[in-house]
């Protein structure tokens, strides 16, 4: 039907559940290669941005234009984990850490994740949180941070594009 996609090893997706470090029930999406074998160990990329599990039935066209395209990664033998984050006001980095690490550990415990090959990726707000996470745990062997606010001191006086409001309001809440 679509010969241009004949060589794509399509992904399947599973809704997964775990608890955060402080016991809050969480969920996320786990994309697996079409030829997934639970007896084998796979490298895994963790990509997050607030709440992504609502995209359970979203179609991902194979494309290099996304930060992390689950179809492209799964077609190349990777697992892709999109965990939801439970935020505590004033602690965005710690909230992401306490949501993501237990989720990754729960998947590693299932036996098919190569714990020596887990990477994390984040863009913008997710990039900031990824930068925070990699300073707090040795769990991730690689990280991709796209357009993160990695220096809040220099960004403090910046202006938000959408609202025209100073960034200080984000950091002072």
Question: At which residue positions do the language-model features occur?
Answer:
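Non-catalytic accessory segments flanking enzyme active sites
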Residues: 1-40, 68
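Active-site glycine-rich loops that stabilize anionic/oxyanionic intermediates
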Residues: 22, 42, 49-54
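Hydrophobic core residues within well-ordered beta-strands of beta-rich domains
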Residues: 24, 42-44, 79
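Flexible, active-site-proximal loop/turn residues at the rims of small-molecule/cofactor binding pockets
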Residues: 35, 51-52, 149
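Short coil/turn segments at beta-strand junctions that form active-site/ligand-binding loops
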Residues: 40-42, 116-117
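Active-site-proximal cap/loop segments of hydrolase catalytic domains
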Residues: 47, 57-173
């Amino acid at each position: 039907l679509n010969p241009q996609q004949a060589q794509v090893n399509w992904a399947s997706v599973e809704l997964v559940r775990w608890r955060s470090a402080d016991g809050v029930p969480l969920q996320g999406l786990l994309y697996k290669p079409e030829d997934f074998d639970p007896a084998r160990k796979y490298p895994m990329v963790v990509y997050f941005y607030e709440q992504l599990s609502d995209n359970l039935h979203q179609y991902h066209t194979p494309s290099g234009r996304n930060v992390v395209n689950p179809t492209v990664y799964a077609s190349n033998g990777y697992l892709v984990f999109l965990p939801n984050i439970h935020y505590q006001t004033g602690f965005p980095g710690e909230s992401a850490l306490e949501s993501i690490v237990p989720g990754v550990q729960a998947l590693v415990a299932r036996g098919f994740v190569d714990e020596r090959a887990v990477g994390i990726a984040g863009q913008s707000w997710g990039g900031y949180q990824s930068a925070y996470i990699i300073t707090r745990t040795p769990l991730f062997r690689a990280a991709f941070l796209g357009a993160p606010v990695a220096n809040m001191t220099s960004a403090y006086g910046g202006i938000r594009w959408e609202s025209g409001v100073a960034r200080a309001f984000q950091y002072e809440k």
